């Protein structure tokens, strides 16, 4: 799984520096962290569902997840401030590269009817968000042992200044973006 990080430093780094005419190596965009988030959905009041979410996140990422809580109360969703909602994991350094390699080489190919990642999922600052509707695309989650199929969000935070730099970085790393029609 170290190959992705090696690929970045040996090939992608130089290509990005040449493509954008960066003067300093510190200007070249890099991935700084990956945030993986999963919610219990309408079962957020169920303590077992929250524990299952935290367990699934720990299995997928290899790092302990922590609970996320509601910031505001929303009566329509029967939600109170401070109520547990799901879990979140922030990955950096080697665990980040290992997880990204797993997403690229294992999870994305297992997605049904995959037509490419949307280039519109950038936030304007070079960060990319991608969602999986089913967590069973990861090999650590077995269909037999889960109570409910849940989705998860993966946010890739980069040091890019804009979406073009972030897009080029992820494209050169091998992320399969959908072609513009």
From Swiss-Prot:
GO cellular component: ribonucleoprotein complex; ribosome
Lipid metabolism among keywords: no
Keyword tags: Ribonucleoprotein, Ribosomal protein, RNA-binding, rRNA-binding, tRNA-binding
An example Gene Ontology biological process: translation
GO molecular function, one term: structural constituent of ribosome
UniProt keyword Nucleotide-binding, yes or no: no
Domain of life of the source: Bacteria
Stretch forming the signal peptide: none
Membrane-crossing residue ranges in chain numbering: none
Function per UniProt: This is one of the proteins that bind and probably mediate the attachment of the 5S RNA into the large ribosomal subunit, where it forms part of the central protuberance. In the 70S ribosome it contacts protein S13 of the 30S subunit (bridge B1b), connecting the 2 subunits; this bridge is implicated in subunit movement. Contacts the P site tRNA; the 5S rRNA and some of its associated proteins might help stabilize positioning of ribosome-bound tRNAs.
Protein family membership: Belongs to the universal ribosomal protein uL5 family.
HAMAP family, sorted: Ribosomal_uL5_B (MF_01333_B)
Subunit-level organization: Part of the 50S ribosomal subunit; part of the 5S rRNA/L5/L18/L25 subcomplex. Contacts the 5S rRNA and the P site tRNA. Forms a bridge to the 30S subunit in the 70S ribosome.
Protein's UniProt name: Large ribosomal subunit protein uL5
Organism: Mesomycoplasma hyopneumoniae (strain J / ATCC 25934 / NCTC 10110)
């Amino acid at each position: 799984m170290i190959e992705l990080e090696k690929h970045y430093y040996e090939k992608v780094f130089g290509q990005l520096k040449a493509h954008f005419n960066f003067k300093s190596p510190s200007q070249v965009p890099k991935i700084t962290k990956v945030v993986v988030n999963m919610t219990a959905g309408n079962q957020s009041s169920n303590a077992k569902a929250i524990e299952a979410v935290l367990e699934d996140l720990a299995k997928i990422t290899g790092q302990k997840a922590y609970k996320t809580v509601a910031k505001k109360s929303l009566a329509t969703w029967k939600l109170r401030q401070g109520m547990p909602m799901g879990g979140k994991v922030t990955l950096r350094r080697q665990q980040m590269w290992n997880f990204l390699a797993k997403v690229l080489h294992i999870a994305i190919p297992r997605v049904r009817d995959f037509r490419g990642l949307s280039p519109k999922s950038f936030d304007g600052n070079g960060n990319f968000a991608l969602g999986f509707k089913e967590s069973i695309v990861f090999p650590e989650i077995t269909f037999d042992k889960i109570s409910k199929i849940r989705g998860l969000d993966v946010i890739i935070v980069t040091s890019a200044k804009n979406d073009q730099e972030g897009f080029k970085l992820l494209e050169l790393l091998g992320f399969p973006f959908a072609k513009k029609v």
